[in-house]
């Protein structure tokens, strides 16, 4: 069709050309080439100029491990919070779930309350003077007094409970999907939902959460890294690698690391000290808790 249009525009057709065959042999390819270029130009002009740009991959977040502390190897860590020079930890598993206050340097439990045996404890966060703890599949969230761990109230949460943090106003919850939920703390009313993604697409299995300097940090279930999430767009803008942390910092052999990970001993604890700008990282059943200084 393009070639025919060109012939019409030029007002001549091949059968009417009065020239030597050899000349026709060179002219016809030239016209076909010009027609092809014209078609490509038209196609380019019809392409939307406002197509979505490619999503850049997450930037590497460098860090330095500045201290290593002991951690209870029986603690199936599901949540970790640092507040007023105290470390708080939520642990999981049926018949074993608890809420604890832990001495940072020794790893000793200073105060503890056990959950009902029918509840599987999950993430924790502290907002003002209240500790909030999720449960896994029981659709129950529990509020405690920070001072004495006295239970204050229970809330219904319609999804699974995995990780929880807060931005000073709202509770922020994960449920193992690629979604993060902003929730009103007074009644657990859902305020908004954030879809999390990186350059490869949606990222699911988001677990433990921590609010750090205006961003959401999350570890991914049974993975050895932490991602930094923009709380407005949901885009993953940074990533911290903790590959083979048990070998590096707890001196496990590769076989020992593989064995304990079969029992669930994966990275799953993030706590931020906003005063000293330091991060604490541990995992389920880990023997060590790391104090980390972010490099950027």
Label every PLM stretch briefly.
Residues 34-36:
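C-terminal motif of bacterial Sec signal peptides marking the signal peptidase cleavage site
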Residues 38-41:
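Bacterial signal peptide processing site
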Residues 52-73, 104-108, 252:
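A short helix->beta-strand "capping" segment at the edge of beta-propeller domains
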Residues 66-98, 114, 118-125, 283-285:
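Beta-strand-rich domains and repeat architectures in extracellular enzymes and scaffolds
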Residues 73-84, 117-127, 157-168, 200-214, ...:
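Beta-rich, blade/repeat-based domains predominating
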Residues 89-93, 132-138, 173-177, 218-222, ...:
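Conserved beta-strand positions in repeat-built beta-propeller and related beta-rich domains
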Residues 103-107, 145-149, 185-188, 230-234, ...:
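Short loop/turn segments that connect beta-strands within beta-propeller blades
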Residues 143-199:
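Hydrophobic, well-structured mid-protein blocks that either form specific transmembrane helices
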């Amino acid at each position: 069709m393009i070639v025919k249009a060109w012939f019409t525009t030029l007002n001549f057709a091949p059968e009417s050309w009065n020239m030597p065959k050899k000349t026709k042999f060179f002219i016809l390819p030239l016209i076909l080439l010009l027609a092809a270029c014209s078609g490509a130009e038209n196609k380019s002009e019809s392409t939307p100029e406002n197509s979505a740009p490619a999503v850049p991959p997450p930037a590497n977040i460098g860090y330095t491990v500045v201290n290593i502390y002991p951690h209870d190897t029986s603690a199936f860590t599901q949540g970790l919070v640092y507040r007023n020079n105290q470390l708080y930890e939520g642990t999981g598993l049926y018949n074993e779930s608890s809420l604890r206050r832990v001495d940072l340097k020794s790893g000793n439990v200073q105060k503890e309350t056990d959950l009902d045996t029918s509840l599987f404890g999950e993430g924790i966060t502290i907002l003002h003077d209240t500790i909030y703890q999720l449960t896994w599949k029981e659709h129950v969230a529990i509020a405690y007094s920070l001072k004495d761990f006295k239970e204050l109230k229970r809330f219904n949460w319609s999804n699974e409970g995995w990780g929880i943090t807060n931005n000073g106003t709202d509770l922020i919850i994960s449920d193992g999907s690629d979604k993060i939920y902003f929730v009103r703390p007074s009644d657990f009313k859902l305020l908004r939902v954030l879809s999390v993604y990186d350059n490869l697409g949606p990222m699911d299995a988001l677990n433990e959460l921590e609010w750090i300097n205006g961003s959401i940090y999350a570890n991914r279930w049974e993975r050895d890294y932490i991602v930094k999430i923009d709380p407005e767009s949901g885009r993953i803008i940074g990533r911290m690698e903790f590959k083979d942390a048990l070998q590096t910092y707890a001196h496990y052999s590769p076989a020992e690391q593989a064995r304990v990970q079969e029992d669930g001993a994966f990275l799953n604890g993030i706590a931020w000290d906003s005063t000293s700008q330091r991060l604490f990282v541990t995992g389920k059943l880990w023997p060590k808790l790391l104090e980390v200084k972010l490099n950027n």
